[in-house]
Design a protein with these regions (language model features):
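Flavin-dependent oxidoreductase catalytic cores
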Residues: 1-241, 245, 250, 257, ...
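Ser/Thr/Pro/Gly-rich low-complexity, intrinsically disordered segments
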Residues: 259-261, 274-277, 290, 294
């Protein structure tokens, strides 16, 4: 979810889904070590429960990332072993680490030694020609022996040579049964399925076989899908239909005095907001002109279907 689930996006999604676990964009351990880690890790308290997803293969740097993430109050530290991009591979992390399970296990142990916050792993079902249940099971067993008890499994193999990251999200076939088998064989572990979930009916079916589902692209293509899940089954939880009053959107886009407007904008709200309401975050005049009593319908119209 690079370039999508930053803290502004997560705040917005939390308005729609009070109960979902939210995940950050992948933040590299090297960036946390060398960069302005406070700017990378800060988040609003309303985002809880929220997980920090870290990328890396150096146990010492990953341990530092876990320690700093825990200090900032994250509810979970997740290791990305699923991203197939060339850039990530060149840094020796992401999906390519499925071929080096002991390295991932070393990171799990080092991170757990630094914090009591749960350390989890997000992975694929395989990579390239290593596309068998036995390969996935062995990888998970090694991480479990290191102490990891929660796995988020994207039910596609990652093709590291020949497919782009975008193609890797759709071209390899979904193999849900492989994830279901993992849960049957390791019932003591928490297994979350990811990949291709676009309907409430799919969620119901998948939850008969695993402990949870992770929603990725569907959450930014149709954020209100999360609100539908919150209210399913009917009566479980209610989300206010006018949750996105203009006065709630203004803080998301308000430019801090020392922060460029581009940092706040990017593309987070574009799929669901009216272009007339926030014209590409072009300046304060548009935002200050918003009056909740006059603009509420503009906010609600794209969302209430």
């Amino acid at each position: 979810m690079m370039d999508w689930t930053d803290r502004h996006c997560r705040y917005f999604l939390r308005l729609l889904s009070p109960g979902a676990m939210l995940y950050t964009e992948m933040v590299t351990a090297a960036a946390i070590h060398h960069g302005d880690y406070a700017a990378l890790l800060e988040f609003d308290a309303s985002e809880h429960p929220v997980a920090l997803q870290a990328g890396g293969s150096d146990p010492a740097l990953m341990a530092e990332a876990a320690r700093r993430g825990a200090r900032f109050g994250y509810d979970e530290i997740n290791i990305n072993v699923g991203c197939p991009s060339d850039r990530v591979q060149s840094g020796q992390f992401g999906a390519c680490l499925m071929a080096r399970p002991e390295v991932v296990a070393d990171c799990v142990r080092a991170m757990q030694a630094e914090t009591d916050v749960p350390v989890t792993v997000k992975t694929r079902i395989g990579i390239d020609d290593e596309d068998s249940y036995a390969f996935l099971k062995e990888f998970v067993d090694i991480q479990n022996e290191a102490g990891c008890q929660k796995f988020i499994v994207h039910a596609r193999v990652a093709i590291l040579e020949g497919l782009s990251p975008r193609e890797n999200r759709s071209v390899p076939p979904l193999k849900y049964e492989r994830v279901f088998q993992l849960k049957r064989d390791l019932p003591e572990l928490e297994i979350i399925l990811n990949g291709g979930i676009t309907t409430v009916e799919q969620v119901d079916e998948v939850l008969e076989n695993v402990d949870g589902v992770m929603i990725g692209r569907q959450a930014y293509h149709d954020p209100y899908f999360l609100a539908h899940l919150e209210q399913h089954p009917p009566g479980v939880r209610q989300v206010e239909p006018d949750v996105l009053h203009a006065h709630e959107v203004k803080p998301l886009a308000k430019k801090p005095p020392d922060q460029p407007i581009e940092v706040v904008g990017r593309r987070k709200l574009a799929p669901v907001t009216d272009a007339a309401m926030i014209p590409r975050y072009s300046g304060h005049n548009h935002l200050d002109a918003l009056d909740p009593s006059e603009n509420r319908d503009q906010v609600r119209e794209p969302l209430v279907r």
